Amino acid sequence: MGKTIKEKLKEAEKYICENFEELGLDDPVEEGYFEEYEQIGGASESEFEDFEKTFGIKLPEDFKELYSYKNGSGYFELLQCDIDDREINFTLFSLEEMKKVKSYFQDRDALLTDYPDYFTDDVIEQMRDNRIKPYLFHKDWFAFATYLNCGYLMLDFDPDKEGKVGQVIFYIHDPDEIIYTASSIDELIDNVWKFLKENFD
């Protein structure tokens, strides 16, 4: 039987606290981030239902499993990711923070082709990924984690023909780019766990 999301994250927390320097982080224990993080509980079923009703979506089960353990991570950089050969650390939004962010980010639809000054045909072709629709902003993308408020991990509820609902994609600003990250929350957490395990075990 494989480890659950909660079990993998508990191990990840330990790796992060013990190896923060190598990860380029402040000491989460000394700074008090980890203590605050430990106080954060999981989201309730009624909170999930409220979120789903607000946006007319059905949250994936693995997302609910993650958020049943921790409804956000505060300042603790829980998600240590290797995306496209870039090591990036994310904090997890709470469901309430996700709602707030949705009011100004990914709150409209805009294709890459709507920005010809930034995205030439060649650039769009280079970015092409048959799992992700060619948007820069899309109402069916939901940011759930952030890297310094300039990069976001997002749940994708409207994938392209080779993608799947609930896949995880990464938006990074300046230069703006959308990058496929994982087929699901489950795979994302598994990647985080493996990345830390391989580096620090």
What are these regions (language model features)?
Residues 136, 147, 177-181:
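Short amphipathic alpha-helical interaction segments
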Residues 1-146:
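A surface-exposed partner-binding patch
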Residues 178-201:
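Long, compositionally biased interface segments
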Residues 150-164, 169-173:
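Low-complexity, glycine/alanine/valine/leucine- and proline-rich hydrophobic stretches
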Residues 68, 149, 193:
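Residue-level marker of positions within ordered structural domains that often coincide
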Residues 71-77, 151-153, 178:
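Short catalytic/ligand-binding loop motif for oxyanion handling, primarily in non-cytosolic enzymes
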Residues 144-145, 157-158, 183-184:
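Catalytic-core loop-and-flanking beta/alpha module that positions acidic residues
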Residues 142, 169, 189:
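Active-site scaffold segments
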